[in-house]
Swiss-Prot record:
Motif (Nuclear localization signal): 22-32
Protein name: Fatty acid-binding protein, adipocyte
Gene Ontology molecular functions: fatty acid binding; hormone receptor binding; long-chain fatty acid binding; long-chain fatty acid transmembrane transporter activity
Gene Ontology CC terms, in alphabetical order: cytoplasm; cytosol; lipid droplet; nucleus
Name of the gene: Fabp4
Primary localization: cytoplasm
PANTHER family documented for this protein: FATTY ACID BINDING PROTEIN
Domain comment in the entry: Forms a beta-barrel structure that accommodates the hydrophobic ligand in its interior.
Record's subunit section: Monomer. Homodimer. Interacts with PPARG.
SUPFAM superfamilies membership: Lipocalins
Modification Phosphotyrosine, positions: 20
PROSITE patterns, per the entry: FABP
InterPro entries found in the cross-reference section: Calycin (IPR012674), Fatty_acid-bd (IPR000463), ILBP (IPR031259), Lipocln_cytosolic_FA-bd_dom (IPR000566)
Amino acid sequence: MCDAFVGTWKLVSSENFDDYMKEVGVGFATRKVAGMAKPNLIISVEGDLVVIRSESTFKNTEISFKLGVEFDEITPDDRKVKSIITLDGGVLVHVQKWDGKSTTIKKRRDGDKLVVECVMKGVTSTRVYERA
């Protein structure tokens, strides 16, 4: 199921993240602090639950979910969203919806890397992680 994603991942590169956060509606000060953070992602599977923990100097967050089941999420920038995460062709597709808006975050393996693509309207940010 999600075994290819299981492990601890450290951020090694980030492109266009500030523009993505701006499009999402994140304020200037939060964008600056979040943009400097180098989070680790810890992904695990516990029964039929997938757990994704993000740890950084900015904020620690954790979501646990069943694939295909909508859940309430509070994002690192404190948005209250409805989220649903599915597995589509080996890609974890995370859709967040709030206030008539939506963003999609895709996680996929590329060799020994974890590539996270964040899309909001026409703005895309790509963040690359390696095993920690």
